[in-house]
Design a protein with these regions (language model features):
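Anionic group-transfer/hydrolysis microenvironments
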Residues: 6, 82, 121
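Carboxylate- and glycine-rich phosphate/diphosphate-binding segment that chelates Mg2+/Mn2+
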Residues: 92-167
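Short beta->alpha junction loops
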Residues: 2-12
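Glycine/threonine-rich beta-strand-loop-alpha-helix active-site module
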Residues: 13-20, 24-118
């Protein structure tokens, strides 16, 4: 079954619709195919298929409910078709709550993708303009990591190398 209703910046409604679709179709894992938004949404959907309530109930910052999930998320497979966010390598999602105008991060140790299929050939069809946007995204993420107040030597080394590669 294919759920293809993810927005460029996913919102709670995307997540909840995707979770309902997953439940209706008896999904036992979730594949995120596309850019960072698609993969972030897949992680959030994987969280919500086996759990009740609203996605925002499980967000710890802002107006989130701060609840613990009762059930582990479904396994997630990430297949990026763009480069820039690196979301296939982490457990975190970025989802927008349109009611409160908040864009918050969610996830936990169980929302790391169990598999990432990273093939540069998937990125060949991306228009040059979007490839440039993704380069800036990678640069900003790396710079953010480097100047973060909770940084450490290993993170600094990786961030500096990423900045060097992108620059």
């Amino acid at each position: 079954a294919v759920f293809d209703k993810i927005l460029a910046n996913p919102v709670i409604a995307n997540v909840m619709d995707g979770a309902a679709f997953g439940r209706e179709n008896g999904c036992d894992f979730v594949i995120g195919l596309g850019g960072g938004s698609s993969i972030d949404a897949a992680k959030a959907i994987a969280m919500m298929i086996p759990n009740e309530g609203n996605y925002w109930d499980y967000i710890y910052g802002g107006t989130g409910g701060g609840q613990r999930m009762k059930n582990k998320p479904l396994p997630i497979v990430a297949i990026p078709t763009t480069a820039g966010t690196g979301t296939e390598l982490d457990a975190w999602t970025i989802i927008t709550n349109e009611e409160t105008n908040e864009k918050m991060s969610g996830g936990n140790k169980n929302t790391f993708p169990v598999l990432a299929v990273v093939d540069p050939n998937f990125m060949l069809s991306v228009p040059p303009k979007f490839t440039a946007y993704q380069g800036f995204d990678a640069l900003f993420h790396s710079t953010e990591s480097y100047i973060n107040k909770t940084n450490n030597l290993m993170r600094d080394m990786i961030a500096l190398k990423a900045i060097e590669c992108v620059g």
